[in-house]
Amino acid sequence: MKNILLKSLIFLSLGSCDENSPNNNLNSNSYSLSTKTILIEQSLDNNNLIIRPVIIQTPNVIDTSKSYPIVFAFHGRGGNNNSWVNHLINYTNSGEFIGIYPQGYLESWNLGPEPSNANDVEFINLIVDELQNYDNLNFDKMYAIGTSNGSGMVNKLAIETNHFKAIAPIASQLIESLPLLDSTNPISVLQVNGAADTTIPIDGGPMLGHVFLDAYESAELWATKFNCSQNPNIIMLGQDTLYVFDSCENEKEIRYLRIEDGEHNLPLHILFQDVWAFFQRF
């Protein structure tokens, strides 16, 4: 069993305080929520230990009568977890949810050809285990969003774990090397792709060391897996198109939003309004 460092760092850039010192945490049954960076210790395949930061972003004042939903957010390749703080800070400040922002090893998520050789499913499992020590978290309302390589990680977690009720893979789709499994549990998916994306083309194909599925085919595979309606409702949003596969197992839903002039760097501050509205339904 990998050890989780009990030491928490104050997230200085946000000017917040961690009222629990490491010594106090060692003797307590649970930790109080506050904005901080925790450190997760993980062993690589070569038995080298690495220490990986995870930002926990909370409102300034915790309502102790409330159990907060949890949103994991995954950066793209070459990015870092700090990028999500500003994107989602209005939601975390207002207490809509608690933000959990892990850091990819070597600034990437290990889907095969990436620089990272870390077991990132294990890493997320370790984070979830650590979060069980905190008060006021609702593990029945846990969601994940990711962009680009982080989107691929979100898909992988949905395929291989049952942590999340809904996911939002942004600017990527399923890849051939990570097929859906018999053990994959029903989950709601909001997939968003830009038709003008040249980094991960909407039509799929070989790119960045992966073979990407066509974006529509990717959504259709989720829908088929969960026995959704195979005739999606098609909603025109100006020039953009939303495909809704409903009537899925366990009252789940698959949505695919095609943004016609969207490139790889989609406007997250705008998109997340719809993502959060989608998450809240599950």
Where are these regions (language model features)?
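C-terminal catalytic histidine-bearing segment of alpha/beta-hydrolase fold enzymes
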Residues: S188-V192, A223-F282
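Acidic catalytic loop of the alpha/beta-hydrolase fold
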Residues: D197-I200, H264-L266
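Alpha/beta-hydrolase active-site loop
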Residues: E114-D135
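A domain-start/cap signature at the N-terminus of enzymes
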Residues: C17-I70, G112, S116-N119, I145-L174, ...
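Active-site nucleophile loop of the alpha/beta-hydrolase fold
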Residues: G104, A168-E176, G194-A196
